[in-house]
Amino acid sequence: MPSVNITKNNKTTLYISGLDQQVNEAVLHAAFIPFGEIIAVQMATDTEIDSNNIHRGFGFVEYELAEDCQAAMDNMHLSELYGKVIKVQLAKTINVTTTSNRAVWTDESWLQKYGNVEDVEEKQEDEKENNQETTSEKKEVSSYIPSSEKRGKKSRVYLDIQIGNTLAGRIEIELRGDVVPKTAENFRALCTGEAGFGYKKSSFHRIIPQFMCQGGDFTKGNGTGGKSIYGGKFEDENFVLKHTGPGTLSMANAGSNTNGSQFFICTEKTTWLDGKHVVFGQVVSGMNVVREMERCGSASGKPSKRVVIVDCGEL
């Protein structure tokens, strides 16, 4: 999509940092459009490098409405895009007129205060947190032994969904153990509960219409918890399967090789997630239930009703 000048209204403009070089304005637009009408998207190009394909790792998204901007910030801050955790905050304004054609990142004083320096500090803090998290995870070892009979084969599981106080119905999913055996086995065993823990009675904590329904955090219920049958987080198995359309089942993560138990069911085609999230299944029955779940979602991701997996297992 073409660049459009960002205004100085910091109530509707987001500053997004930590962007991978694969991210362009079209990708940024696609990632943030679920939250509301976007007026403009700009990437900060590196003026020291003679190439239109190189950016400085951050960009701006301007929304028409302040509430949409706030919803995007609340939902996308510390989320993952192209394998990197991004940071989203309200853009800091500089003293220029709204009719100025000068991009905000061309002001070096702005960059020193709000741009790259901040990113370095945040990166150092992130590395510190990640090191602490990795050390903690190494202590968590599972005694569960995954079924060797199920690995390498397709299987089917079900999720019985309750929305509010009403039983909405059953979702049946085919797991692609023939393509991603480790990932599929993790989900299957969490559905049956044979490892001593699993998805039963857990909720879908994040639902965004025209995007996806995310669940699987059975330890904290807010998107910060969950664990795999392997004792902690496990690696990205492969990216053979793609996010081709509604009903795609994929692993939620916080960056490369951080798979646990959280997953999401796509309600639309989400190709920008290809190569970054491991697809391991497909809804084969009950897509109407997924659509009913989707209607409980919001731009911020917070469901209007509690959506719970009241029962689950293998077919």
Curated annotation (Swiss-Prot):
Region entry Disordered, spans: 119-148
Task: Identify the SUPFAM superfamilies for this entry.
Answer: Cyclophilin-like, RNA-binding domain, RBD
- Give Gene Ontology CC terms: mitochondrion
Give every RRM domain span. 12-93
The alphabetical list of record keywords is: Coiled coil, Isomerase, RNA-binding, Rotamase
Q: Give the Basic and acidic residues compositional bias ranges.
A: 125-141
Its EC number is 5.2.1.8
The protein's matches in PROSITE patterns, at most eight in alphabetical order, are given as: CSA_PPIASE_1, CSA_PPIASE_2, RRM
Specify the enzyme's EC class, one word. Answer: isomerase
- Domain (PPIase cyclophilin-type) spans 158-314
Recall the GO molecular function terms of this protein's record. Answer: cyclosporin A binding; peptidyl-prolyl cis-trans isomerase activity; RNA binding
Q: CDD domains this protein is in?
A: cyclophilin_ABH_like (cd01926), RRM_PPIE (cd12347)
> Which reaction is the catalytic activity of this chain?
[protein]-peptidylproline (omega=180) = [protein]-peptidylproline (omega=0)
- GO biological process terms on file: protein folding
PANTHER family xrefs? PEPTIDYL-PROLYL CIS-TRANS ISOMERASE, PEPTIDYL-PROLYL CIS-TRANS ISOMERASE D-RELATED
What the protein does comes down to: PPIases accelerate the folding of proteins. It catalyzes the cis-trans isomerization of proline imidic peptide bonds in oligopeptides. Combines RNA-binding and PPIase activities.
Q: What is the protein name stated in its UniProt record?
A: Peptidyl-prolyl cis-trans isomerase E
Q: Which organism is it from?
A: Rhizopus delemar (strain RA 99-880 / ATCC MYA-4621 / FGSC 9543 / NRRL 43880) (Mucormycosis agent)
